[in-house]
Amino acid sequence: TDLLLADNFSRAAQSCNLKHIVYVGGILPKDNLNISKHLLSRFEVEKVLGSRNTPVTAVRAGIIIGPGGSSFRIVTNLVKNLPVMACPKWTKSKNQPIDLRVALKSIHQIIGNKNYYNNPIEIGGSEVVTYMDILKITAREMEKKRWIFSIPFFSLGMSKLWVGLFSGSNSNFVSPLIESLRHDMTLNSKVIVKDLPDYSIKETIKRALDKNIKIPTVPTGLAQTKDKNTVRSVQRISNPSKKTA
C-alpha cells in the first residue's frame, strides 16, 4: 500500500509540476543486511517518490518528540500504567531523538532549497540515548517512582503484546515500531541542516509533557471525489545482475 500511494503521489507531483517533495521518514540503521520491514518500506517509499522528475529530499529523522506525538504517547502511557518495567534487549538500542520544534525548523529550511534536492538528510538531537533512558527521564519528569530495569533477552512477540496492552496503542502501529527499535539508529549522514537550535532530551521531554500547549487538530477525512476506475500495482523484483533493463 505504501508503495502504491508513493507511486500515485509521484505521478501527481509530476503531472502538476510540483517543485519539491519533502518526505519525512526514519534514520536507517548501519546494519542494512538485517533491516526491519518497517524501515525497508520507508526506504522503498523514498526511491519510488524519487523515480520521476520532481526533486525529492528524504528527511531521515530520529524519534521525533513533541506534544501529542504518537510514539511518545506510548512512552507516557507505559510510565503511567506500569510501576515496574522489565525492559527487553531492544530498549538498549541507541537513538538520537529530536525535538519537534527542531524537526519543523529543519523542514522549513529544506523546502525549496536546491542544495537539498535529491539528497537524503538525517536529523537528530545531539544526545545519544536508549529507549530505556527515555522511559527513565519521562518517569522523573512525570514525578512517577518507577522501577525500570533490563532483562538480557529479546522476545519480539512478547514485546508487541506488552507494549500494545499497557500503552493502549493499536497493534498495527506498535508492531512495526518495535521491530525497527531493535536497530541502533544514530546519525550517519554528512549532509546536515545548519543553524538549528539544540535542546537537551530532558528539555524536549518536559515540553512534550506540558499540558498547557495547544495541539493543532488533525483533519479526520477528505471530501470524496469520483476517480477513474483504474488498477495499478507496484512489484518488488530483485535484480542481482544490476541490469538497467
PLM segments and residue spans:
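Short, surface-exposed alpha-helical segments at coil->helix boundaries
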Residues: L39, F43-E46, F72-R73, M132, ...
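Conserved catalytic-site region of short-chain dehydrogenase/reductase
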Residues: I27-L39, I63-G69
